[in-house]
């Protein structure tokens, strides 16, 4: 076997391995995680989870149309929910997407600080700020442990993208025994929202409006 042929075969094998690794990584990005079931807390609490409303997706630093910039009305609703949740004693947690893989960094606008911080228009009322590198927020062990430490058993999800990160986070929550609801007028997606919300319902994920949530807390 000539050296040239050997090198071609070697490069082909390396390329195949890299391709398989990339496909496996991509597949893992779009899967709900599994974890231990939460305990039956004697003093269960609720949490509002604000997902991926950050400068790289919704603010002035966005470059890729991962989601359409939200209207001021949608941000107003999210901020109103944050205020009400705080007043009622609910926990509020903020989740940010921070990709560690270079390919995903390039595709999603980079890892620069200006792109991964929470959208400046969103009210930050605490330091419950968690990073994830997959669609499911439960891929963050710190976030999962935070909910356990606070005895949370009920989650309300707002943010982007309703078709992916919020959806897989909701499934991750169900896998752990949480009661979970998505706030229909406080989420957004490039996909048709009616279809996205119907997908939630088929999976047993509750869909409520911000008005309904405000009346419950």
Where are these regions (language model features)?
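A short glycine-rich beta-strand->turn/loop micro-motif centered on a GG-aromatic cluster
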Residues: 156-160, 178-193
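N-terminal signal-anchor transmembrane alpha helix of single-pass membrane proteins
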Residues: 1-28
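Short acidic-hydrophobic, aromatic-tinged amphipathic segments that line or gate anion-handling sites
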Residues: 130-131, 204-216
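Active-site-proximal loop->helix
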Residues: 190-203
């Amino acid at each position: 076997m000539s050296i040239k042929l050997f090198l071609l075969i070697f490069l082909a094998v390396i390329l195949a391995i890299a391709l398989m690794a990339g496909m496996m990584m991509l597949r893992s990005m779009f899967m709900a995680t599994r974890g231990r079931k939460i305990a039956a807390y004697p003093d269960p609490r609720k949490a509002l989870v604000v997902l991926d409303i950050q400068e790289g997706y919704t603010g002035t630093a966005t470059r890729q149309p991962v989601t359409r910039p939200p209207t001021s009305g949608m941000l107003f609703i999210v901020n109103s929910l944050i205020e009400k949740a705080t007043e009622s004693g609910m926990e509020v947690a903020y989740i940010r997407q921070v990709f560690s893989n270079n390919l995903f960094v390039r595709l999603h606008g980079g890892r620069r600080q200006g792109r991964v911080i929470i959208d400046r228009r969103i009210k930050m009322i605490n330091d419950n700020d968690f990073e994830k590198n997959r669609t499911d927020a439960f891929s963050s062990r710190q976030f999962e442990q935070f909910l356990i430490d606070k005895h949370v058993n009920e989650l309300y999800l707002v943010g982007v993208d309703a078709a992916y990160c919020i959806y897989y986070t909701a499934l991750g929550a169900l896998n752990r025994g949480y009661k979970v609801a998505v706030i229909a007028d406080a989420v957004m997606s490039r996909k048709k929202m009616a279809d996205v919300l119907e997908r939630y319902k088929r999976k047993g994920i509750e869909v409520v409006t911000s008005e309904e949530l405000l009346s419950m807390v």
